[in-house]
């Protein structure tokens, strides 16, 4: 796993015990999963808008910035749920070399 992801994961774990007034991440943890999911939704919308703007302007700087926010808040969500980013990387690795259609067909139906 990337050193950056490891460092972020460690900081997110460390913030679980921090005072909510001293850390943005600690304040999210303190407010609970619903607040984290709300932020994740906001960042998703901002990323989509930035991508549409980038397609028109050719400037991807905002989409990179917003994607970083989206990934970050996804990592906060995973940490809140007791999951490490490595679990997502393992899932991506499992899918590597598997066609998207085959992967989708292998999922249990809802």
Curated annotation (Swiss-Prot):
SUPFAM superfamilies noted in UniProt: all-alpha NTP pyrophosphatases
| The reaction(s) this protein catalyses | 1-(5-phospho-beta-D-ribosyl)-ATP + H2O = 1-(5-phospho-beta-D-ribosyl)-5'-AMP + diphosphate + H(+)
Give the subcellular location. Answer: Cytoplasm
Could you tell me which InterPro entries the record lists for this protein? HisE, PRib-ATP_PPHydrolase-like
Q: What class of enzyme is it?
A: hydrolase
Superkingdom is Bacteria
Q: Which GO terms describe its cellular component?
A: cytoplasm
Q: Which UniProt keywords apply?
A: Amino-acid biosynthesis, ATP-binding, Cytoplasm, Histidine biosynthesis, Hydrolase, Nucleotide-binding
The entry lists its GO molecular-function terms as: ATP binding; phosphoribosyl-ATP diphosphatase activity
- GO biological process entries: L-histidine biosynthetic process
Q: Which Gene3D superfamilies match?
A: MazG-like
The pathway to which it is assigned is: Amino-acid biosynthesis; L-histidine biosynthesis; L-histidine from 5-phospho-alpha-D-ribose 1-diphosphate: step 2/9
Carries keyword Amino-acid biosynthesis?
yes
Per the UniProt entry, the Enzyme Commission number(s) are 3.6.1.31
The record's annotation in HAMAP family points to:
HisE
Per the record, the similarity remark reads: Belongs to the PRA-PH family.
Q: What is the protein's given name?
A: Phosphoribosyl-ATP pyrophosphatase
* Gene (name only): hisE
């Amino acid at each position: 796993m990337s050193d950056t992801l490891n460092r972020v994961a460690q900081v997110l774990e460390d913030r679980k015990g921090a005072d909510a007034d001293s850390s943005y991440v600690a304040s999210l943890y303190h407010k609970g999963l619903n607040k984290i999911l709300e932020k994740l939704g906001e960042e998703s919308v901002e990323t989509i808008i930035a991508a549409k703007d980038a397609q028109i302007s050719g400037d991807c700087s905002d989409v990179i910035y917003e994607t970083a926010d989206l990934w970050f808040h996804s990592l906060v969500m995973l940490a809140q749920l007791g999951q490490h980013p490595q679990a997502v990387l393992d899932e991506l690795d499992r899918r590597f070399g598997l066609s998207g259609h085959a992967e989708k067909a292998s999922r249990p139906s809802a």
